[in-house]
Amino acid sequence: MRNPFLTFRAPTRKTGDYLVSKFVKKDNFSSLRLARAYTFSTRSTAVSQFSLLSLSQRSFQSLKINKGIPEKHKIPLISSKQFSVTSKRSQNGSSGSNSDANGRKNGQKNDDSKKKGLNGNDPKKVFEIALNGNTILGGILVAYILYNVLSPNANMQEITWQDFRQQFLDKGLVERLVVVNRNMVRVILRGGVASGSGQYYFSIGSIDSFDRKLEDAQRQLGIPPSEFVPVAYHDEVSVLATLLSFAPTLLIIGSVIYLSRRASGAAGGGQGGIFGIGKSRAKMFNHETDIKIKFADVAGVDEAKEEIMEFVKFLKNPKFYERLGAKIPRGAILSGPPGTGKTLLAKATAGEANVPFLSVSGSEFLEMFVGVGPSRVRDLFATARKNAPCIIFIDEIDAIGKARGRGGQFGSNDERESTLNQLLVEMDGFTSSEHIVVFAGTNRPDVLDPALLRPGRFDRQITIDRPDIGGREQIFKVHLKHIKAADNIDLIAKRLAVLTSGFTGADIMNVCNEGALIAARSNSNEVQMVHFEQAIERVTAGLEKKSRVLSPEEKNTVAHHEAGHAVAGWFMEYVDPLLKVSIIPRAQALGYASYLPKDQYLMSRGQILDQMGMALAGRVSEEIFFGPEKITSGASDDFQKVTRMAQAYVTQYGMSPTVGTIAYPIDTRETVQKPFSEATAQMIDEEIRKLVKHAYERTKKLLLEHKQGLENIAQRLLQKEVITYNEVETILGPRPYAYKHLNISELMRQSEYKNDHDPRNPPIPPSPQQPSA
């Protein structure tokens, strides 16, 4: 059945023509119902809406008359009572309302709209004030009215002393004067005196001066002292002035509240505003939260993952452990170098656990206000108890967990220590809970308070170290899943794991991402091994500076410097395998030699001496070929490495026969007094100097023996800029000390195609071994 009702907005000429042609002349409807009136603008007020209603009525009456509608077609206009007054800004509005029959047909829908209010909006939000022209004008009007009402001088006219004397005092119209607040005189005229303003006042500088002038003026007028104009003195408190005096304070308080609300809103946690500053900023995750990281995404830290999974299993099924009398540890600290996966493990725990997971940073407990830290700790654990069983993760706990009393020589740590004390109480105090587990992450477990590490609080300390070659291979496989690689992922991961000794999980993720970016930059459809190798160089050595042009003299010096490193490393026994030598500037370095260190946890005396000799080989080569007068500053970084190794050799490893097996701290910045005598310090300095000198002379002797081979390496570098292990082997011959842990020749043969595609490396025939000098 067709709907017999027509809904339209406020009538226009086009609307009237349509009604007359389609309905009125055909006698197809009997009445018009104006259900609602809207202005569809920001100036929507009751006055404008009722004005629109009147306009609509007049328009319909004019429509019926002007269109020549017969008397029998006179149509009554029925005005509905469904009007709503709103000051809320409306952009779209509504097109009218249905008739009674249509309303009965859609009764439930209309009821819902009534509950929501006008236009379906929430009635609680109807009276939001919009910042527009009417609002500003209304505010100015209200301020003006308040000023007139509250200001005592608002209805008074200010005059000068001359006006006062000529118009009032000389004519004898002044009944009395009132000195207000010692700076203003109010003129009270005699009764019956007609004046334009009614009341007048003038300002004075001082009361004594005013009294003298008034007395002199009255004497000049011949007024006897007994008939002088009486003067009264009193103080008045202006309501407006009082309010204005509080205005700066109120403005500051309002600004603080506004900024705190914005800050809390941006943080997305805790109660808004300054009144919620003691609330915890922890974010809660549960099984309904979209966390995509799972334990399957964490690789290379199998032992730590197993420890964490044990906590999760206990919270999921505590009865399995309790039947054996076991108690879950209260907490665990995840420690290790940056980028090893501490926070990633916590994210995986949040993604796997079916219990609530609260995550917070240690720095979020500390604010500029006293007492905020302990309050947030209490609120954090109160939230955890409400959601028990629950897991709490505090990242960078060393921000609040440093040992008490440290660093207090130059300032107070009361607030941080109070926060730490509250954390200790919450973890193992009278109100502690057995179903709350606390995880914490830190890079510096050595600075934490012993009370925090004792059993009953953080029972377990899980150290997450840099992954070994097997761990790196697993991590590469995880990240290579999302990359379109040219070769088999397992083969790529195995090779890259060998090339990235000492890399953390974050470094490996960066290498994979950089490799994909390099492939995209070169318009490649797939990521090849050469792209990953370039990414490793990008991460370890820095960005290649092709725009940095060296002079021929500088380039020759850099080539001989890097050739010295390569030759020394080739003929020294305990040196890491050489992969590549380059004189292309990268980052702050003008050249570099790339080595392949193995996973090693102990260093012998011979290894330290060989490492020192190889680091000094660059300076030694410059001295051999250019003389002592032309050595450069390019070896400054090498000297720093050598000095650190020599200091550790003498003061930490106990390898110096003179100093003996005694450990001395070299870094004494945190202490005022050195823990050893001046004689001991002098002996340490002398031993370090002797050790470095011995390494220098030993390296110089080695390079002089292979001077011709060094020169050949330098010339090849000047020709090609980059040479690899196989080319060095072609020039210098087989290495005297074979690498036992891997086959370098086979490893480098897998990437020989790289040199074939590099325009800097044209193919060259192998040359016979050069005779040694």
Curated annotation (Swiss-Prot):
Gene3D superfamilies, A to Z: 1.10.8.60, 3.40.1690.20, P-loop containing nucleotide triphosphate hydrolases, Peptidase M41
CC cofactor: Zn(2+)
Subunit structure: Component of the m-AAA protease complex.
PANTHER family the UniProt entry points to: AFG3 LIKE MATRIX AAA PEPTIDASE SUBUNIT 2, ISOFORM A (PTHR43655:SF2), ATP-DEPENDENT PROTEASE (PTHR43655)
Reaction it catalyzes: ATP + H2O = ADP + phosphate + H(+)
Alphabetical list of Pfam families matching this protein: AAA (PF00004), AAA_lid_3 (PF17862), FtsH_ext (PF06480), Peptidase_M41 (PF01434)
Keyword line: ATP-binding, Hydrolase, Membrane, Metal-binding, Metalloprotease, Mitochondrion, Nucleotide-binding, Protease, Transmembrane, Transmembrane helix, Zinc
Entry's cofactor comment: Binds 1 zinc ion per subunit.
An annotated GO BP: mitochondrial protein quality control
Region (Disordered), start-end ranges: 83-119, 752-773
SUPFAM superfamilies: FtsH protease domain-like, P-loop containing nucleoside triphosphate hydrolases
InterPro entries assigned to the protein according to its UniProt record, in alphabetical order: AAA+_ATPase, AAA_lid_3, ATP-dep_Zn_Metalloprotease, ATPase_AAA_core, ATPase_AAA_CS, FtsH, P-loop_NTPase, Pept_M41_FtsH_extracell
Organism: Schizosaccharomyces pombe (strain 972 / ATCC 24843) (Fission yeast)
Binding positions for ATP per the UniProt entry: 298-299, 340-344, 479
Homology family: In the N-terminal section; belongs to the AAA ATPase family.
Active-site residues from the entry: 562
Protein name, per record: Mitochondrial inner membrane m-AAA protease component yta12
Subcellular location: Mitochondrion membrane
Composition-biased stretches (Low complexity): 87-101
Domain of life: Eukaryota
MF annotations from Gene Ontology: ATP binding; ATP hydrolysis activity; ATP-dependent peptidase activity; metalloendopeptidase activity; zinc ion binding
Organismal lineage: Eukaryota, Fungi, Dikarya, Ascomycota, Taphrinomycotina
Compositionally skewed regions (Pro residues) per UniProt: 761-773
Signal peptide stretch: none
